């Protein structure tokens, strides 16, 4: 029986998850003859059925708790094999007794009778084993579509773990280790990967549930098999942790993994989290890459002053609209004068040798001078508009921060907080003035229909039309000290950018990008208070320590360190709406400490002892 099953297991050992075999299954029909000589034998039919069923595609069903499949029962095979063996042994003993009693008969006749009855016993054994194997194969492997059409039967469901479970269940583990209560995972089973260990755990669960349903084993055996399933789950978990820790140590930022793609230099994403490791990454938490200043560290009085400056700048910009219209009219007059001067020059000609300039030359020179004056006046107005836009930008950012400090948001509506200090009340009054000036309406309850705070905190005014990119590019803060304003007027584009970088107004753009596409600070959404947002990173063990550690002893401590580091990266780098608040983070860590503190301490102790012994 086991000899036959050994050949059968060797035949399907090359079966993987893809549903095909790497080498043909050897034939063995029970009496030592080849398949060619006994084409109608039971084992040849079984081999043909296995070969044909291996070509079917397995379905993907992950539910292992309640198995809908007809699970293979080893005890039935063993009992049928034992009973068949007893039948054969009894028939052989009967034949030997008959041979002793009828020793006077011819040797040829008696040998033919013994061989005939032995062959009949072997045939019965082959039929029983073939029936059991057919049931096994039918429950594990699906039939081909052609076989379905011939038989008209529906396709058998495919067990998710049976691809590897069937390969392993007839081996030493099931025969000698599980059933004999000695399940150390060494030898062949120490070489299994995490997926195979998970499959073994799933198959063991199915096997135990089948034993419980049929009542085929005592409670002690069932509990032992359940413990074996838990050991396989723990083994798979340890192997996955080991692989994750090794991958983390080899490539902590995930740059060599093709799943991590970055659109900008130094930018990459892990899942839905975006990281930045480009130029200026050390200053990413303190220098904002947008065109607005960080307002959270400013006092209420400074915020109020910024709001007032923004309101005044907006008022001046509104007053400047007629000037823009007059400039447009002057430009149109200038164009007509230019056309007239060009026409008169064409008629009179340009005489360089003339002692006195003629009328056309004088008209053209007057046009050139007027054009220069208008260009200078327009340029100074553009500079003023740039400074005013910057102040409006700072006023918007200050208003967003003031909204966060002084207002409560409920269902998208902002209402004034009740317990405010005197400075915060002054700031709130200034903010109410700001909302009235900006035309933000209030509902009958007194709540403001203000956009979300994050939209306000960006603080970049919307500028459309020609020159918008230039205004955005040259927008810079106004440096104020001792109530004096220092404004540098005559600056080129590079000087403006250097000045803005020196004022910590935006980050240095990489020289390789021609369009100055710098990553924005708000895209990565590190919390504004950088002093409190970064936690102490736990020590990650080096690669040699992880590789030399045993997976069941010291691995959990290093995985815990990697987990804390990854959790810290997750908290400080998620999008704003996905960042857990402090209560959620505290609850998460509290659960971790309550559930795993003792285990972690013990593992750290074991790990330290291992390090001391090395």
UniProtKB/Swiss-Prot annotation:
Query: Which residues lie within the region annotated Disordered?
Result: 23-68
Annotated Polar residues bias: 49-68
Q: Which domain of life is it from?
A: Bacteria
Similarity section: To C.trachomatis CT875.
Give the protein name, as stated in the record.
Answer: Uncharacterized protein TC_0268
* Source organism phylogeny: Bacteria, Pseudomonadati, Chlamydiota, Chlamydiia, Chlamydiales
């Amino acid at each position: 029986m086991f000899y036959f099953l050994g050949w059968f297991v060797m035949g399907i050992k090359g079966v993987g998850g893809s549903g095909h075999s790497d080498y043909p299954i050897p034939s063995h029909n029970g009496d030592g003859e080849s398949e060619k000589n006994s084409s109608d034998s039971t084992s040849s039919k079984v081999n043909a059925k296995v070969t044909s069923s291996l070509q079917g595609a397995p379905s993907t069903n992950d539910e292992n708790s309640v198995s809908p499949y007809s699970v293979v029962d080893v005890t039935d095979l063993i009992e049928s094999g034992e009973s068949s063996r007893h039948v054969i042994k009894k028939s052989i003993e009967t034949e030997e007794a008959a041979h002793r009693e009828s020793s006077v008969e011819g040797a040829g006749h008696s040998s033919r009778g013994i061989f005939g009855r032995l062959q009949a016993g072997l045939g019965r054994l082959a039929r029983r084993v073939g029936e059991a194997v057919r049931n096994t194969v039918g429950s594990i492997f699906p039939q081909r579509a052609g076989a379905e059409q011939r038989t008209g039967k529906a396709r058998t469901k495919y067990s998710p773990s049976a691809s590897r479970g069937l390969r392993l269940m007839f081996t030493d583990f099931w025969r000698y280790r599980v059933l004999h209560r000695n399940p150390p995972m060494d030898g062949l089973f120490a070489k299994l990967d995490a997926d195979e260990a998970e499959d073994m755990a799933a198959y063991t669960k199915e096997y135990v549930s089948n034993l419980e349903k049929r009542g085929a084993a005592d409670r002690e055996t069932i509990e032992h098999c359940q413990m074996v399933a838990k050991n396989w789950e723990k083994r798979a978990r340890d192997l996955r942790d080991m692989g994750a820790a090794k991958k983390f140590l080899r490539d902590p930022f995930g740059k060599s993994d093709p799943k991590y793609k970055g659109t900008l230099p130094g930018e990459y994403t892990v899942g839905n989290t975006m990281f930045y490791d480009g130029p200026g990454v050390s200053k990413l938490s303190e220098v904002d890459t947008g065109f607005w200043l960080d307002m959270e560290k400013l006092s209420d009085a400074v915020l109020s002053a910024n709001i007032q400056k923004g309101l005044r700048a907006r008022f001046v910009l509104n007053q400047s609209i007629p000037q823009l219209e007059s400039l447009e009219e002057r430009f149109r007059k200038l164009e007509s004068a230019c056309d007239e001067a060009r026409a008169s020059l064409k008629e009179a000609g340009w005489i360089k040798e003339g002692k006195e300039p003629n009328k056309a030359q004088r008209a053209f020179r007057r046009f050139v001078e007027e054009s220069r004056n208008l260009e200078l006046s327009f340029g100074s107005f553009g500079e003023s508009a740039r400074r005013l836009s910057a102040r409006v930008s700072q006023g918007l950012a200050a208003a967003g921060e003031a909204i966060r400090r002084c207002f409560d948001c409920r269902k998208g509506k902002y209402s004034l907080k009740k317990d405010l200090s005197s400075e915060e009340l002054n700031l709130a009054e200034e903010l109410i003035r700001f909302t009235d000036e900006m035309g933000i309406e209030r509902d009958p309850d007194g709540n403001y229909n203000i956009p979300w705070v994050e939209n306000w905190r960006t603080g970049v005014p919307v500028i459309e039309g020609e020159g918008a990119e230039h205004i955005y590019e040259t927008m810079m803060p106004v440096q104020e000290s001792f109530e004096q304003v220092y404004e540098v007027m005559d600056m080129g584009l590079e000087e403006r950018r250097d000045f803005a970088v020196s004022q910590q107004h935006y980050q240095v753009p990489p020289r390789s990008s021609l369009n100055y596409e710098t990553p924005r600070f708000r895209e990565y959404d590190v919390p504004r208070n950088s002093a409190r947002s970064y936690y102490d990173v736990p020590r990650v063990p080096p690669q040699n320590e992880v590789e030399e550690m045993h997976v069941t002893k010291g691995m959990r401590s290093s995985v815990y360190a990697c987990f804390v580091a990854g959790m810290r990266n997750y908290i400080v780098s998620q999008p704003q709406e996905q960042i857990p608040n402090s209560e959620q983070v505290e609850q998460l860590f509290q659960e971790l400490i309550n559930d795993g503190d003792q285990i972690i301490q013990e593992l750290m102790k074991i790990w330290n002892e291992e390090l001391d012994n090395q």
